[in-house]
C-alpha cells in the first residue's frame, strides 16, 4: 500500500511540474467554430473552452481494431472491464455520440479506425446535453460509402455466473442505412455475504440487531435495437430507431441475527426474497433539415410505455420457537408512460453560433401497491420543461460560451403538487496562456428534480422497528457549480487541474426519523444546503511519448458538508483516486486498474465506491481478438455503508460478493468491415425516464 501511495504522489508531482513545447497541431479551423481553440501546440490535441479535440497518428490508426480502441486512449477515459464499456476516470455519466447522434458501445465498435477524423471531448457539455451527462464524447467520421460491418463479442468467467455478450450488423446502400444490435449482461452469484448492524434507542430501551446473511442474487439485462437512417447531404436527415430493453433481477437470501433489547438477547432467523422485471419498448424519431447554409432545424421525439413488476417477501422469526417478528410481503405493479420532445435551431454568424431550443419530458406512473399498510392505488406525474439558448464565439485570446435557460419542474401526486420555474444561466470562458497551456472558467446554475424512489409512497420493512419510505413532499434541489481549470498538453503529458466549488440549496438528504407506527423510518428531506470543494488532478503520462506505456491518474482531495433541516452540520473529507497502467506492443495490449475506495456522503450515510484491482490483456489476429483477465485480484468486490454520528440509528453494512474474488475471464471477439456506413449529425439526443421500482 505504501508503494502504491508513493507512486501516486510521484505521478502527481510529474503532472504539476513538467512542461514541454512541441510543434503545432494541423487540425483545420473554420471561421465560425462553436468555440475556437485556445492555442495548444500539441501533436494530437487542441484545447477549446468547453472541449478538447483529438486526432490520431498513423501508428494508432493501424493498431486499433475499431474506433472504441482509439477513444479508450483519451487521458480521462478508461475501459470498464466489468461492463466492457468506456467510462470517465473522474466518474459521473459519460455520453457517447457519432457525428452528434447518441451512440451505443457497439455502434462505436462498428466504426473502422480509418474512418475516424477526430474526437471531441466535452468536459463541459453544451446546453442540449448538460442535464444528461457530465462528459460528452463526440466521434467525427468521414463521408459515407456503400458497405457493411458486423461483429460479435463474448466474455465469460470460468467459475461463476458472469457473461457479457453482444452482436451488431450495419448495412449501407446509397443514402440509406440499416442497423441491428443485440447485447446481454448476465450475473448469477450464489455467495454474497452481507453483515448489517442496527443500533438505536427507542422508548427508553436500547436495541441492537446484528445480521449475517448469504444471498443468491443476479440479473439479466438484454437490449435489441433496430435502426433505419436516410441522410441526404446538405439537405435533410431522418432516423427511426426502435429499442427493446429487457431486465430481470432476483435476490434469495437466508441468514440469522442476534437481536438485543437492553439485557435480553434473542436469536432470530431471516429470509428475504425479491424480484423485479420489465420490458421497455422505446421509439426514437429524429428529423433534421438545413433551412439554409446558416440555419438548421432539428426535431426529436422519444416515447415508451411499459409495466414493471416488483415483489419482495421478507420475514424474521425467533429461533427456535418460530414466533414471527415481522412479515413484509410487498407487491408493486407499475405502469409507466414517458414521452420526450425537443425542437432546436442553430444559426451561424460570422462571429460564432447561436443555438436555441425547447425540450419537454413527461412521465406518468400508475401504481398498484400491496405492502405493510395494505392495498393502495396511486398515480404520479413528472413534467419538466426546458427553454435554452447559448452563443459561442471568440474575442482575441478569449473564447466564450454564454447561455441562458428557463426550467420548469412540475411534479404531481395524490399527496402534493410541486411547481417551480428556475432561471438557468451558464458562462464558460477560455484563455490562452502560452504554447500548450490554457485556463478555463465555467459557472452554472440549475435545478435537479427528486427521483421517483425518493418521492415514492411505498413502505418496506428493513429490520425490527426499522422501515424505509419515500417523501412525496420533496422539492427540487438548486445547484450552483463553478470550475476553474488549468490544462497542460504535450507529447508526454495531457492533464487538467480543476479547482471546483459546488453549492446545492435544498439538497435532498436521506435520514432516520421517529415513526409512530413502526419505530424508525429511513426517509428523505430537503436539507438546508450542501457544499463541496476541492482540486481534481486528472490525465495521462506517456514516458516514451507513445502507447508503449501509459499511466492514467485521477486524484481528488475534497471536502463536503451538509446542513440538515434542523441546523446540524455534517462534514466529510476524502481523497478520491483512480489509477490505470496500460501498454500496447504490436498486436498485444495489457492493462492494470487500481483504486483505494473512499467514503463519501450519501444522505445519512457514508458509502464507499466499488473497489478495483483488475488486470486484463488481449491479442489481435486479423479480425479476431482474444481476451483474458483477472478481476478483483485477491479480493472480493466490496461495498461499505455506515451512518453518521448525527443519525438516530447507528447503522453499518458490509457487502461482499465472494464469487468475484480473483475472477478469471476469457473472451473472444470478431469484427469485420467493408466500405463505410452512413453516419448522421444528430443535434438532439433524448431518452425517457428509467423504470420506477421502489
Per-range role (PLM):
Residues 20-60, 81-82, 122-123:
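Short, acidic, small-residue-rich periplasmic hinge/interaction motif at the N-terminus
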Amino acid at each position: 500500500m505504501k508503494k502504491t501511495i508513493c507512486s501516486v504522489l510521484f505521478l502527481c508531482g510529474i503532472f504539476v511540474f513538467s512542461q514541454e513545447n512541441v510543434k503545432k497541431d494541423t487540425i483545420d479551423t473554420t471561421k465560425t467554430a462553436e468555440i475556437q481553440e485556445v492555442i495548444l501546440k500539441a501533436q494530437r490535441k487542441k484545447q477549446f473552452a468547453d472541449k478538447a479535440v483529438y486526432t490520431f497518428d498513423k501508428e494508432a490508426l493501424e493498431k486499433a481494431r475499431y474506433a472504441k480502441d482509439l477513444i479508450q486512449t483519451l487521458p480521462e477515459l478508461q475501459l470498464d472491464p466489468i461492463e466492457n464499456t468506456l467510462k470517465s476516470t473522474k466518474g459521473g455519466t459519460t455520453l457517447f455520440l457519432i457525428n452528434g447522434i447518441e451512440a451505443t458501445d457497439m455502434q462505436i465498435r462498428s466504426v473502422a479506425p480509418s474512418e475516424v477524423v477526430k474526437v471531441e471531448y466535452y468536459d463541459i457539455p453544451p446546453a442540449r446535453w448538460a442535464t444528461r451527462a457530465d462528459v460528452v464524447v463526440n466521434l467525427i467520421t468521414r463521408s459515407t460509402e456503400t458497405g457493411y460491418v458486423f461483429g460479435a463479442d463474448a466474455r465469460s468467467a470460468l467459475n461463476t455466473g458472469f457473461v457479457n455478450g453482444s452482436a451488431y450488423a450495419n448495412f449501407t446502400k446509397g443514402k440509406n442505412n440499416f442497423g441491428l444490435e443485440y447485447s446481454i449482461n448476465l450475473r448469477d452469484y450464489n455467495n454474497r455475504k452481507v453483515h448489517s448492524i442496527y443500533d438505536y434507542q427507542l422508548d427508553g430501551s436500547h436495541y441492537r440487531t446484528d445480521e449475517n446473511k448469504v444471498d443468491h442474487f443476479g440479473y439479466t439485462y438484454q437490449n435489441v435495437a433496430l435502426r433505419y437512417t436516410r441522410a441526404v447531404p446538405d439537405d435533410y436527415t431522418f432516423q427511426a430507431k426502435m429499442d427493446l430493453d429487457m431486465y430481470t433481477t432476483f435476490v434469495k437470501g437466508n441468514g440469522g441475527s442476534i437481536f438485543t433489547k437492553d439485557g435480553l438477547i434473542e436469536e432470530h432467523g431471516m429470509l428475504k426474497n425479491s424480484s423485479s422485471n420489465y420490458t421497455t419498448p422505446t421509439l426514437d424519431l429524429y428529423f433534421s433539415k438545413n433551412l439554409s447554409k446558416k440555419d438548421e432545424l432539428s426535431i426529436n421525439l422519444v416515447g415508451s410505455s411499459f409495466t414493471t413488476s416488483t415483489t419482495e417477501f421478507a420475514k424474521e422469526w425467533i429461533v427456535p420457537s418460530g414466533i414471527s417478528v415481522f412479515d413484509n410481503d410487498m407487491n408493486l405493479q407499475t405502469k409507466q408512460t414517458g414521452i420526450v420532445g425537443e425542437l432546436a435551431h442553430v444559426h451561424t454568424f460570422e462571429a460564432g453560433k447561436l443555438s436555441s431550443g425547447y425540450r419537454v419530458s413527461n412521465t406518468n406512473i400508475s401504481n398498484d401497491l400491496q405492502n405493510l399498510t395494505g392495498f393502495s392505488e396511486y398515480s404520479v406525474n413528472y413534467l419538466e420543461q426546458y427553454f435554452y439558448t447559448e452563443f459561442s464565439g471568440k474575442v482575441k485570446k478569449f473564447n466564450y460560451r454564454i447561455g441562458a435557460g428557463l426550467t420548469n419542474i412540475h411534479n404531481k401526486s395524490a399527496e402534493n403538487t410541486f411547481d417551480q420555474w428556475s432561471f438557468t444561466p451558464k458562462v464558460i470562458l477560455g484563455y490562452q496562456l502560452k504554447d500548450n497551456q490554457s485556463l478555463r472558467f465555467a459557472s452554472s446554475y440549475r435545478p435537479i428534480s427528486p427521483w421517483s424512489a425518493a418521492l415514492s409512497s411505498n413502505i418496506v420493512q428493513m429490520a425490527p422497528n426499522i422501515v424505509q419510505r419515500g417523501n412525496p413532499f420533496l422539492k427540487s434541489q438548486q445547484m450552483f457549480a463553478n470550475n476553474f481549470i488549468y490544462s497542460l498538453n504535450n507529447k508526454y503529458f495531457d492533464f487538467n487541474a480543476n479547482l471546483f466549488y459546488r453549492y446545492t440549496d435544498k439538497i435532498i438528504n436521506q435520514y432516520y426519523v421517529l415513526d409512530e407506527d413502526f419505530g424508525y423510518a429511513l426517509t428523505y428531506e430537503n436539507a438546508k444546503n450542501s457544499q463541496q470543494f476541492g482540486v481534481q488532478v486528472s490525465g495521462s503520462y506517456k514516458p516514451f511519448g507513445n502507447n508503449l506505456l501509459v499511466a492514467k491518474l485521477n486524484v481528488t482531495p475534497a471536502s463536503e458538508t451538509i446542513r440538515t433541516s434542523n441546523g446540524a452540520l455534517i462534514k466529510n473529507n476524502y481523497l478520491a483516486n483512480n489509477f490505470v497502467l496500460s501498454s500496447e506492443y504490436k498486436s498485444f495490449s495489457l492493462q492494470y486498474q487500481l483504486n483505494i475506495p473512499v467514503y463519501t456522503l450519501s444522505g445519512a450515510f457514508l458509502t464507499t465506491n466499488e473497489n478495483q484491482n483488475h488486470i486484463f490483456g488481449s491479442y489481435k489476429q486479423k479480425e479476431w481478438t482474444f481476451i483474458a483477465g483477472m478481476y478483483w485480484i485477491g479480493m472480493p468486490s466490496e461495498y461499505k455503508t455506515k451512518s453518521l454520528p448525527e443519525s438516530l440509528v447507528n447503522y453499518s453494512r458490509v457487502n461482499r460478493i465472494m464469487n468475484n474474488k480473483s475472477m478469471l475471464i476469457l473472451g473472444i471477439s470478431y469484427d469485420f468491415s467493408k466500405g463505410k456506413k452512413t453516419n448522421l449529425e444528430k443535434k438532439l439526443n433524448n431518452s425517457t425516464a428509467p423504470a420506477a421500482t421502489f
